[in-house]
């Protein structure tokens, strides 16, 4: 099996952007998140502003239209700052958004994806 993964400038920029965001906004509160067992809602808003919550969703449905590699890179950098936030992000992007994209019809996608 050949895993020839092509990393381009877009992926490099994404990695650096998410890493900086995570270091500044997630890492300083990671212990609090784990101790309190509570996810800070403001992080969802910020992740959305970065275009990460619908990273693999086509732009016509309100997403960023990026690859699964981009999703993986974002999750990796978020998880570097907080495994808890990384797991929440992964669940959102793979169990929720991805399933709507893959298994929903156009009407469901148009109604739902832009809001999550």
Task: Locate each region found by the language model.
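Intrinsic disorder at enzyme termini
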Residues: 1-10
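Glycine-rich flavin
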Residues: 13, 20, 25-113
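Short N-terminal secondary-structure initiator segments
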Residues: 1-2, 17-20
């Amino acid at each position: 099996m050949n895993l020839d993964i092509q990393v381009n400038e877009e992926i490099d920029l994404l990695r650096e952007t998410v890493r900086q965001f995570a270091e500044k906004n997630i890492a300083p509160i990671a212990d609090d998140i784990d101790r309190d067992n509570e996810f800070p809602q403001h992080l969802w808003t910020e992740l959305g502003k970065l275009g990460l919550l619908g990273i693999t969703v086509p732009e016509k449905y309100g997403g960023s239209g990026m690859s699964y590699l981009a999703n993986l890179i974002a999750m990796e950098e978020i998880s570097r700052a907080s495994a808890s936030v990384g797991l929440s992000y992964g669940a959102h992007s793979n169990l929720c958004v991805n399933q709507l994209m893959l298994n929903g019809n156009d009407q469901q996608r148009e109604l739902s994806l832009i809001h999550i």
